[in-house]
Amino acid sequence: MYEEAHIDKHCHNNDLAMTFQAVVRFNQVIATCMEYAFYHPNTFVLITADHETGGLTAKEGTFVYTSKNHTSADVPVFAYGVGAELFNDITVENIQIPQTIASFMGKDDFGDQSTYQSLVK
């Protein structure tokens, strides 16, 4: 698991240059994960965000932030590997993502405290 929290931080500040640098770092991590998954076919890669921040839009060839806060915009979910087909062409709620990952580990009662304890051991 990897989180590039600086994307969110810099979007709150409407700082496009720093956001871009954070996205480049995130893309490098994604490339490493995808290469690993390519050579290890039982690997599942999931790329998403827990929310959108800043309302970044492109207007007349210029990128413009519309907010310094989280928005209600949907965020994409990209999946690769075993089980990726579960995320093809659908809209999911955030809670469905960890539930699906837990089910890959044989845990059907995600959210139950005992399940959480067994996953973090």
Give the positions of each predicted feature.
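Feature captures the catalytic ectodomains and active-site-proximal regions of enzymes
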Residues: 1-121
